[in-house]
Amino acid sequence: VKEVKIAFMLKIEQRIYDIDRVICGNLDMMESSNVSRDLISQNLLAQSRNLVEHIAVRAYGQGQEIPLNRETVPIAMAYLKKNNKYLFLRKFHSFLQESKSHYTPDNEGAERLMLKYYQYFVMIKTFVKQEYDMNLLNNLNKFPINTDKTVAEFYEKIAERLKVNRPSIDYNRNERMYVHKVIPFIVDGMPYFEMVLTPAFDSTSKFDRFIVYSKNMVPKHYAIKAAIFYDDIEVDGKKMPVNIMTEYSVSIRPCEFNNFASLFGIKIKMQAASAEYIGMMNYLTNSGSSLLDLVLLSDKDYAICMRKMFGHSHAKHFEPVLNEARKLILSDQPGSNIIRYLLHIMNNKVLKLQRQNDNNKLLSGLRLKWGCIPFDKMPFATSLIQHNPEATELFESIDAEGREHELMARYIQGNMSTNSRLYTPIKEVEKFTENVDSQMDVFNDSIYYKHEGRRLAKFGQNIYVKEALDNTHCIMDELFHKSQNGLQGYADAITVWMEERQNVDSDEKKEILQKLFEKTHVAVIYGAAGTGKTYLINHVSQFMDSHSKLFLANTNPAVENLRRKVMAQNCDFMTIRKYIMSKNVPVDVDILIMDECSMVSNADMAEVLQKVNCKILLLVGDTYQIESITFGNWFSMVKYFIPRYAWHELKTPYRTKDEDLLTLWEKVRELHEDLTEHIVANRYASNLDQSVFDKKSEDEIILCLNYDGLYGINNINRFLQQNNPNSEIRWGLWTYKVGDPILFNESERFIPLLYNNLKGTIVGIEKESEEKIWFILEIDKVLTELDIMNYDIELLDPITPGKSVIKFYVLKKKNSDNDETDFSGDTDVPFQIAYAVSIHKAQGLEYDSVKVIITEEIDSMITHNIFYTAITRSKRDLTIYWSPETQQKVISNFQIADAKGDATVFAAQTHMKMRKIKN
């Protein structure tokens, strides 16, 4: 309905202008030195939700005077779900609910959020001018947005390409895509959108993400089909490919409807060509809403929408399913939170992971696995089976009202996994509730009976998770007891062994070897990158040559590195996960050697110690490198609870002889005050420019933190591939060229022969047909005919000594309508193009030349450990591409991770003696 223009101002518009005056008044205070930017940010955030809700009421009124009260706002917000042009308002409102109502931000957090929401204010300013001829936020430019100039230049050029008129095309034959991320950016006061997409198959990974740019915001919850044009921009004389999206439509996979229906015991076979399917997709595309939004409508609106969607359809397969879902959700039956979330995201892989063949009596008879029950009870504090929902998706699908106990627990869990802290101070969670004790009781009473270990408990002024404390206590107690007595005869035996061989390369290592098990049955070795930790492991292994040895590490690359470098007999190598999960593994061994200990979680370490029966332990790692993804601080903590003779530190690096580089590593490691000066003086820092694409060495790598974004791994790989002069072969969405460097992924097809992180180069590509392609790769591993006997691989004549040449095929994935053929291993390309790799993936690797890219977009995620890991990959040349502002922000936020605080509280609680450590 087209709104009639009115000559007078509506009361709701007057209210909007009142809010605008408050916001603009705060922006004016930016120029005052007496008012902190943090305070202004918090004030602006407080007004943002009011602004969005008032604009929603203005839209709902369609030019009519309507009362503004508590009842009107929810109706107005629901009205926004009827038209896709309001999508950005709904998204903004959802972000605000998540960040303001439930996570009261600290000063820095408020400012960061304001920067994030700046784009939405620009969208509001543009929208209200176009729709209602209202002039809002006229001094928004006073908020200082420090945009990276290089990134801004790219976006300006992309915006120019987005202004080009392109033909309308039939994109129905294009592949479906999942929308992974939608990022607004502003050029000349106009909003545009960067979107990260992945092919809509169950088996896609982060390596399959690619970026498109559009004038339109796209809803993120469902798969889409889109018109995508391949274009390029020119920067510093270099052409860089960009993908331009002009049109899209929601295109949920038919198998996702089938699998969702099966949760209710209803068997359907959705067809993409059916009137029913087309009607649903048209409605979802035009409205921008989700199927969850649909079932939450009033009876009257629901009936109208159902007629719109299914009016032209004779067969209505999914209508009964929606009716059942609506009935379950509106009556708040057991299982309703799961159905809410699944209906909101409709992701095939997630759906199938939750499903079972039998009815679950505790979940209203739905065919959902028992493991889904914790999520149904406390969705903000638990996960679905093999799926961790994003906070944004949770807030959009499930009402957080009355779930303060879950949000508090979520914060504590995040503090453990992100900051490696066993104890969370009570004062940090008081922002969720005024009565922490009562909310802890509510949480503990709601825990599923099989998850008693997740209970929250208090000690002093701290809160902790029971099983985390139990695991930590188990580790410290076991290692303490093993440190009380030495290995009888060790001192004499190791002395004789070293004298006979005369091959230990430094006095530092000789001294450590001499003392290693003299007084203890557990030895801990801390060492920086390149100090010879693996070298020392090899010597211990050779000394214990006739004894049974079990080598464990967290990742396959670390395991393979040990397998290659340990020259001893009686060895078993495996990942920690495999050791824990497998039955047929060695339990009784003479020595357990664990590498990369800083990456091992407390839960995994406790399980290993409970399973293995070993005489001695050697635990090796670097607390300054990347830590465990889940909570893991035992390796940093253990030195406070074992005698000083039981732990040692390797300090001399051997990876490089470059004195300036060695000094840089030390200054970063110890956080010296003159770190910035050293970086500048030795020209390690550079603004992001053309030189990032100019190779300094054949053995060179570019390191990025993330896969997405303009300077994410996937985009950098595409840019650098442009420099490869060989002809391109297109396969699906990706382009391959002879000469491209590659790294293998965690592909089930060739594990363990071709392991994750194995380096190689494409030396040949043969496209047999549109359905089949052959890759010929030179890999950094020597293989024989016997090695490949049980694999679908051809071994060709070698090109370079110490390497092998292999050949294998990849088949084209079938239509994404169905899921039966999705998991065929030979449809996945098992490697990624690797001109650039992630910092995490580079751990354990080394290169002559390393370039690290850090942009404003990801500066808050660069921790001290991540930065240290990145710069210590280099053997010779190092360049860090960042702006001076980003450099200052990253370095000023560095903190050395130290478990001393946790160790102090832990010692008081468990009465274990804590040892003083001299700096």
Regions found by a protein language model. Give the residues of each.
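Extended, solvent-exposed polar beta/coil surface segments
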Residues: 1-251
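N-terminal pre-P-loop "Q-motif" helix
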Residues: 500-521
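Conserved adenine-nucleotide phosphate-binding loops and their immediately adjacent elements
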Residues: 488-501
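Conserved RecA-like ASCE P-loop NTPase motor core of nucleic-acid helicases/translocases
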Residues: 523-566, 620, 675-718, 728-735, ...
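N-terminal accessory nucleic-acid engagement/regulatory domains that precede
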Residues: 132-135, 140, 145, 150-486
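Core RecA-like ATPase module of SF1/SF2 helicases and allied nucleic-acid translocases
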Residues: 531, 570-573, 656-659, 694-919
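Conserved, well-folded catalytic cores of nucleic-acid-processing
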Residues: 478-485, 543, 565-569, 611, ...
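ASCE P-loop NTPase helicase motor core
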Residues: 515-518, 522-681
